[in-house]
Amino acid sequence: MNTPTTGSHPARYPSAAAGEPTLDSWQEPPHNRWAFAHLGEMVPSAAVSRRPVNAPGHALARLGAIAAQLPDLEQRLEQTYTDAFLVLRGTEVVAEYYRAGFAPDDRHLLMSVSKSLCGTVVGALVDEGRIDPAQPVTEYVPELAGSVYDGPSVLQVLDMQISIDYNEDYVDPASEVQTHGRSAGWRTRATGDPADTYEFLTTLRGDGSTGEFQYCSANTDVLAWIVERVTGLRYVEALSTYLWAKLDADRDATITVDTTGFGFAHGGVSCTARDLARVGRMMLDGGVAPGGRVVSEDWVRRVLAGGSHEAMTDKGFTNTFPDGSYTRQWWCTGNERGNVSGIGIHGQNLWLDPLTDSVIVKLSSWPDPDTEHWHRLQNGILLDVSRALDAV
């Protein structure tokens, strides 16, 4: 990446002392402002290795020409609790912003943008013929026989078109997503919780119907289990081998792991904004990274084309993007720009703008995990910056 020179931003970034986070509070404000950048100090984590590269250091870019088009951009970034923001056009960083106390080489938790990384690894294995998307999940993981995954295909898991008894309420301690997190070590385990992620996945039930979208974080961890089974690698090793080592990343990524060493594929990856932008660059380059091909052009084409709009039931998404869909672990807007995004709670975005050959990364620490208010503000920024790029 080629980056122009600039200065810094004065906004205050809270310290650990301001929050004193615990295992049960680190995801909540104000603790999350610190914890999202220091997750390895809260939850056991493993390195997702990059390959050694001899790359020059990068100077920090400013908001520059983008700010000329959007004079209130920095204010909007501050209002939406932005920790890191980056715009990559082609191979040039044309805009970059970091809150005071957060540096370009700091990692940030991606939350569910991690899902898009997992989907990409699955795509690489589909290209190799090691995973057949049409095959049932239990062809690869027979331990899931008798669960809700006994019958659905790998593609239905990728596209989240399975009816599952899984409440994705991030603030309800009785919800399945909270039990999932406790089993993975993200919170203190309660009496009766499954011992680890593998065991948790085998407990999931549902009516067995398919074809209608239901967002469910467990699906991604099932995909990671399939990845482990067909490669013989731990998921963290597969993520390195099939994606991260090919990006010429500045730093290793990290991923949280449970007591068995299973990587929290659906939400546990942390990396720098610049390295996440490299993932987007690879997608816009047809699946090719500096270290070699990651996924086929056909896989990328299918992601950028979007999935089944008829299957989409997420009104929060379609209220903003009426033609939106979800496919292969990516959110597809269906808008005139063809924007596609990896999205994570608390304001994480990896946004692709094919019209301008640009990638936008926004990493944040919203005080609420997942509300229409914050998504509306966030999507407004991403769309306005995309349109501003037309004139840059």
Swiss-Prot record:
Recorded E.C. number(s)? 3.5.1.46
Residues the record marks as active site: S112
Its Gene Ontology molecular function terms? 6-aminohexanoate-dimer hydrolase activity
Q: What class of enzyme is it?
A: hydrolase
Reaction equation(s) it catalyzes: [N-(6-aminohexanoyl)](n) + H2O = [N-(6-aminohexanoyl)](n-1) + 6-aminohexanoate; N-(6-aminohexanoyl)-6-aminohexanoate + H2O = 2 6-aminohexanoate
Annotated metabolic or biological route of this protein: Xenobiotic degradation; nylon-6 oligomer degradation
GO terms under biological process = nylon catabolic process
Where do the segments described as Disordered lie? 1-27
Keywords assigned: Hydrolase, Nylon degradation, Plasmid
InterPro entries linked to this entry = Beta-lactam-related, Beta-lactam/transpept-like, Diverse_Enzym_Activities
Q: Which domain of life is it from?
A: Bacteria
**PANTHER family, A to Z:** BETA-LACTAMASE-RELATED (PTHR43283), BETA-LACTAMASE-RELATED DOMAIN-CONTAINING PROTEIN (PTHR43283:SF7)
Q: What does this protein do?
A: Involved in nylon oligomer degradation.
Q: What else is known?
A: The EII enzyme is 100 times more active toward the substrate than the EII' enzyme.
Please identify the protein, giving its name as recorded: 6-aminohexanoate-dimer hydrolase
Q: Which organism is it from?
A: Paenarthrobacter ureafaciens
Q: Which gene encodes it?
A: nylB'
